[in-house]
């Protein structure tokens, strides 16, 4: 199985709105496996297709401690939201940067599973946060976009400094 390269901020592909997936294919099934492999290896709890340079509406998530509850969603959409939660988020495309983000705590999600079937389910707390974070990627939005201007600027400066330090070491 191939580990995919994770696209890093400020790559322009992270700002593109992704195209819907017309149907499930063998290629997409392989991509889903590779995305899970890449996400687990990173390690992370969610990964969106644009983070691996694929501009399609596809996300994978697994918030379980044992990494045995994988969820792959094609063309995911949030149907309903309720509540509010603040969670410290990070992103595999902006490594080392974490910030508290306010989001709905409960969501109703609809999408296509890897068998090509339409599914709908409720997600709460961390799973809801993770799915919303990944769907944001499909719409060209990053978690830092939810921050105030000052916090966003500080996060970006910190990230750029860390990347420069890594490049020089």
Swiss-Prot record:
Its EC number is 3.5.1.88. One of its GO terms (molecular function) is peptide deformylase activity. Its cofactor is Fe(2+). Pfam families: Pep_deformylase. Gene3D superfamilies: Peptide deformylase. Keywords: Hydrolase, Iron, Metal-binding, Protein biosynthesis. The keyword Metal-binding applies. Fe cation binds at residues 91, 133, 137. It comes from the Bacteria. Binds 1 Fe(2+) ion. Removes the formyl group from the N-terminal Met of newly synthesized proteins. Requires at least a dipeptide for an efficient rate of reaction. N-terminal L-methionine is a prerequisite for activity but the enzyme has broad specificity at other positions. Belongs to the polypeptide deformylase family. This is Peptide deformylase.
